[in-house]
């Protein structure tokens, strides 16, 4: 019964939040498809590279701070969304922090799959996902059985799998379009800004939480902290 409860808590709470950000970033992949298809038909690599670069930059600008925010504010976010389910929340705090980092890689890989299909290589996306799934399954078998790791092993295996999938999907897209990604603009700058954003958000949350005599609603504190962090980011 206990293993079922732990796994149910993980899939019902942490995995639910984990799937939100990629749903948003997937739209960027779809939005670029018409112009990408046109560029492919004209064999206009410059237009393809320009569109892909913009897509990767916008996706990173959204995915990196969102993922890091989930990682550092996992407990407040769980309480905000699933208040009253205390035992389940306690089970999911650490796994969701790990999944927060995994969100970044999944969110970046998701639109890349749509692009691979447009470029006429859907089998590459399937192969990459299958390989990532095998890695995840293998690590799940090893890690979840360790008592000290437990259900966090599922989150760790997801993180490793998503890193692998993201690297290969981005590499495939870049290779097929001869794109040399602007690492600084796509990854370094958003990551630095996201770190500042996350630090600001967690400090704001801890400060407001300690001011117990104000009796501030915890949902308001969470929203306010996210808002302050977002202001710092943008």
Where are these regions (language model features)?
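C-terminal transmembrane helix end/exit motif
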Residues: 159-210, 232-234
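Alpha-helical transmembrane segments of polytopic membrane transporters and translocases
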Residues: 5-25, 56-61
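Interfacial segments at transmembrane-helix termini and the short loops linking adjacent helices
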Residues: 71-103, 213
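Membrane-interface helix-loop junctions in multi-pass transport and translocation proteins
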Residues: 123, 133-167, 181, 203-227
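Membrane-interface junctions at transmembrane-helix termini in multi-pass inner-membrane proteins
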Residues: 101-131, 141
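Short alpha-helical transmembrane segments in multi-pass integral membrane proteins
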Residues: 51-74, 80, 151-177, 191-192
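Residue-level recognition of transmembrane alpha-helices
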Residues: 12, 59, 96-99, 103, ...
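Helix-loop junctions and terminal segments of transmembrane helices
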Residues: 25-42, 52
